[in-house]
């Protein structure tokens, strides 16, 4: 049943992706720079990022935004729009996240040390079951498949739960990422 639930949520997520080019310019017009470290953020409803302010994380603002280090004026507005396009519908992923529970039992298949940044290819599939009912309450598939020295296909489906942040933050956001052009290695 959890797989059907994810498929329905995934379909809704894909439909919401179509609204990002329309919503991002409007939402960016009504947001301003906010301080870092004020987690959780609540701007932008389903289009906003719960873990970073409207201008984006510090690395994005400093290096990857269209106008590096600019957070105000027209250029800051463009950076906020680009941030929402780069991180689409994070609020939706948070709203339909899997809540952490100490009574979960983890079942892991595959290699749990994979990483696109550390050049460690492979895959894993994780299921979480409720200890008392033994019902599957969540899953995650993560795969890193390099095809050149600097590029890989990165796939993450389910809920992003096989990380330290699941217990720390108390939730695992919904994910449905298939990136055929991901950078392989720390770039």
Go through each PLM region and give its residues.
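Intrinsically disordered, low-complexity segments enriched in small/polar residues
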Residues: 35, 42, 46, 57, ...
């Amino acid at each position: 049943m959890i797989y059907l639930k994810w498929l329905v949520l995934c379909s809704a997520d894909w439909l919401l992706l179509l609204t990002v080019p329309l919503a991002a310019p409007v939402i960016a017009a009504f947001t301003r720079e906010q301080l870092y470290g004020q987690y959780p953020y609540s701007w932008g409803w389903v289009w906003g990022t719960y873990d970073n302010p409207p201008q984006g994380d510090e690395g994005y603002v400093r290096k990857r935004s269209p106008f590096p280090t600019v957070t105000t004026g027209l250029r800051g507005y463009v950076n906020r729009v680009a941030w929402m396009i780069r991180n689409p519908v994070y609020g939706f992923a948070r709203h339909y996240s899997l809540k952490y529970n100490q009574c979960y039992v983890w079942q892991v298949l595959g290699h749990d040390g994979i990483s696109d940044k550390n050049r460690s290819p492979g895959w894993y599939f994780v299921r979480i079951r409720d200890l008392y009912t033994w019902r599957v309450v969540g899953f995650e598939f993560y795969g890193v498949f390099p095809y050149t020295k600097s590029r890989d296909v990165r796939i993450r489906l389910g809920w992003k739960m096989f990380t330290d942040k699941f217990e720390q933050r108390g939730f695992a956001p919904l994910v449905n990422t298939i990136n055929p052009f991901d950078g392989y290695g720390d770039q």
